[in-house]
Amino acid sequence: MNLSPREKDKLLVAMAAVVARRRLERGVKLNYPEAVALITDFVVEGARDGHSVADLMERGGAVIGREQVMEGVAEMIDEIQVEATFTDGTKLVTVHEPIR
């Protein structure tokens, strides 16, 4: 299987999001990379499902709460920018204060 660097990055984020979901199910608090991966995956998959940029910007901040991440993680993430593929092309989605 020949994957471009971008495709490899997408798979890495998706796998990290799977790990993050499993940890949340077990009640384990997420670290920085897991939290970012989970929110990023939400945005990418939401774009594929047909949601709008505005909708994903808003809903991206409700994926995980402060109580689900390790101490200090929420303060480390001011915004997350995700380049996602929508039905009408690739767009940049910015989620401000993604962990509330």
From Swiss-Prot:
UniProt cross-references to Gene3D superfamilies, sorted A to Z: Urease, gamma-like subunit (3.30.280.10)
InterPro entries: Urease_gamma, Urease_gamma/gamma-beta_su, Urease_gamma_sf, Urease_subunit
Keyword Cytoplasm on entry: yes
Keyword set includes Cytoplasm: yes
EC number(s) given by UniProt: 3.5.1.5
Pathway: Nitrogen metabolism; urea degradation; CO(2) and NH(3) from urea (urease route): step 1/1
Signal peptide range in chain numbering: none
Alphabetic keyword roster: Cytoplasm, Hydrolase
Cellular compartments annotated: Cytoplasm
Alphabetical GO biological process terms: urea catabolic process
Enzyme class name: hydrolase
GO MF annotation: an example: nickel cation binding
Sequence similarity: Belongs to the urease gamma subunit family.
Subunit field text: Heterotrimer of UreA (gamma), UreB (beta) and UreC (alpha) subunits. Three heterotrimers associate to form the active enzyme.
HAMAP family, per the entry: Urease_gamma
Annotated protein name in UniProt: Urease subunit gamma
